[in-house]
Every structure is written in structure tokens, then in C-alpha cells.
Amino acid sequence: MASTSIDYLEKYSNDASIKNLGTIKEADLEAVMECEPDIIFIGGRLSKSYDALSEIAPVVYLATDTNEGLVNSVSKNAKTIASIFGMEDKVDSLMSDFGARIDTIKKISSGKTALVGMTTSGSFNLLGNDGRCSLIGVEAGFNNLTAAGSTSTHGNESSFETVVQQNPDYIFVMDRDSAISTAGAKNAKEIVENELVKTTDAYKNNHIIYLEHSNVWYTAEGGIQALDIMLTDLEKGLK
């Protein structure tokens, strides 16, 4: 198991009996080979290692597809895993309450505009509906004002004048530096809540929502536990 900042994975990371197989971006092929696995599961960041890992054992590639939507991707991934272990009947119960929770969020988001941003290295990058945080502008129903842009990796750097000009009802913020534990970085609030942003309706109405578990949004999107946490962040922020 590689090191992690995800709380619900810490017990595995800290378990000395579980072998460290590398990072989320680079597998330790020698360590994987020593484990003699029957099957290997990988996510999007390890896609370049697919061929090398396939020489060790069959590889199951699990990723999110923004064309299908995050929730459908999570369900599809869960069903793929469940089918391998004969646990198909478990998936529906695990996914059962997500639809109702999203419907409740939609009662708030209906007719509301939003900007979805990521703070990184002192900058504020805007995210569309084609990558990270797409849950907000797709399933959750907010009208993401930068939805049409291609922002699938780290978004497009934005000026705060643009934020003021678009004047959304809500601003959602993911703190990338916090997610990856960047030493000495400014926190998201220091970056976002400047004199320009304080003139927006979102600020005046207390509608700037800092996603509490940025590490989950940034590195763990695509799993059932991650989706539960992400929806909880939205629910708490929208109270």
C-alpha cells in the first residue's frame, strides 16, 4: 500500500503487513511481481502502466467517465468489482441513497449559477464539467458558468476580475495544495476571499463553499466511499 492522505485508507497505509506497491501515479513493478497477484486493479493515474502490469497478472482498469457521469461511473466500477467476486447483489444497496441525496441538492441548485474552482500554487483555476468536481455541474444540477470549457486536468487559470464579471450565485472551491499537502502553501480562503471576490453575490450571501475533503475530491473520485464524502461536503456546505 502506498502512503495516503485519505482518512479511510490510513489503516491500510499504516499496516506493516501490507506491501507498499508504489504511488497512485507509478507502480513499483518489482513489488507487485513479488506479491504474485491473481488480478490487479488500477485507476486512471496508472493507465500508462497498464501494459507493464498486464505482464504480471490480468488488469482491471477502473476510471470515471464524465460522459457517463460520476455517479454512473461509480456504479459501473462497483458492479465490475462485484462481478469478479460474486457480490453483485451488494451494489444496489451500497448505491441506494445517492439518488435521493442528489435530488435534495437539486432543490437548492435549481436555477442557480456557479463557478467551480481549484486553488493551486496561489492561483485560482476554473473547472468545467469534463473533469474534477464535475459532480457539481452535472449530477448536482448547478449551472456551471464554465461548463463549456475544456478543463479536464487542472482547469484554466482565471483572473478574479472574471469571477466578478460572471458573478455566480455560488462559488465552489477545491484546495489542491491542501489535498496534496503542499508545504507552505496559502490556504484556499486566503486566495479566494480578496477584495474583488468580496463584491460578488456569492460572497455577500455566504455562498462560497470550500470542499472540506479536498483530498478525496482530488485523488479518490470514483469510489463509493469517496462519493458519499463528496455528497456530504455539498450537503454541509449548502445548509
Where is each model-derived feature located?
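Proline-aspartate-enriched helix->loop->beta-strand connector
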Residues: 36-42, 58, 163, 167-172
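Extracytoplasmic ligand-binding site segments that recognize negatively charged/polar headgroups
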Residues: 3-4, 48, 62-80, 113-135, ...
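Structured C-terminal subdomain patch of bacterial secreted/periplasmic proteins
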Residues: 72, 83, 92, 170-239
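A short, structured surface patch at a secondary-structure boundary
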Residues: 1-34
